[in-house]
């Protein structure tokens, strides 16, 4: 008999902007904060955790096994094991579905899952410095790990922004459509922040400073804008292109976590779950149009669950770019159902801390489902390199 898997204790840090409040707070620190908070929210003891699975993409220079560092810093006993996964933008969500698989297999009852990323602290790399340079360093030999490891398609040698331009060409998506999508994201995120919509899901980050502690408790990436101002932004990746800073996601820092648990263990401990895991899937596409990844992933997850998109009450689809978000909406049949998609804005406004984003959208989905009384929810992301991942949950 297949074990039922539930989610409890979900939380996230606020999302920091590039060069912003969290720029000096490392990935291991951010991860430890959400792990500690998730344990408190779930009402369990740290020693009851069987395993930790956490996503992180930009791991160069962080030291061995970031997930292990996070858990030790969070006070989880050394006897508990941990591993870090890198499925690029899908890492945080895949960590959760991996945890569900382990629990379904009967190999664990309680798993800490999620993701962490500080893109600000990604190092520059000298890949040929091991054996020295005869004279000057060759041009192009200094690699920005943030750009290369997080934002570059290695198969074609170009920025993720070009993959969005490719989708625009394929689908005939206009600059006006992209800007309208970006403006929607900013507007909804601003409304959510102003009304305190995210307060329940956020754990503040306390940053010690010479003039006293800074309590960081609000997403800082959203920007006030107007359609007119967005229309004036120059193309960011291609001459004559239409992808701009206003219709693309940001470079950010954050962490998010959720405790994945067998339903029988939750019942035994008297814990009321936030939701149960219904299905999950991944899918592959051509790397040059990586933003289409949510299409096969979501279709597979829906098919496994015996559902259609009409059965889903709430959707969190990561906004890597407006271009890919529009294409995904068209193909998956929710372009005319946007009232249930990214209802509090998405990554264009909130930000995209790559290793954490999958867990972030899941946390946001779970709390918004509670507020609305929604029954079924879908979280999905595109993944650099040409993939997508998706997870469907049902409120309990």
Swiss-Prot record:
Belongs to the thiolase-like superfamily. Thiolase family. Keywords: Acyltransferase, Cytoplasm, Fatty acid metabolism, Lipid metabolism, Transferase. Induction: Highly expressed during syntrophic growth with butyrate (at protein level). Seems to be constitutively expressed. The keyword Transferase applies. Pathway: Lipid metabolism; butanoate metabolism. This is Acetyl-CoA acetyltransferase. Its EC number is 2.3.1.9. PANTHER family: ACETYL-COA ACETYLTRANSFERASE, CYTOSOLIC, ACETYL-COA C-ACYLTRANSFERASE. The active site is at residues 89, 352, 382. It is an enzyme of class 2 (transferase). It comes from the Bacteria. One of its GO terms (cellular component) is cytoplasm. It holds the Pfam family Thiolase_N. It comes from Syntrophomonas wolfei subsp. wolfei (strain DSM 2245B / Goettingen). Coiled coil: none annotated. It catalyses: 2 acetyl-CoA = acetoacetyl-CoA + CoA. CDD domains: thiolase. It is found in: Cytoplasm. Involved in syntrophic growth of S.wolfei with butyrate, as part of the butyrate oxidation pathway. Probably catalyzes the beta-keto thiolysis of acetoacetyl-CoA, leading to 2 acetyl-CoA molecules.
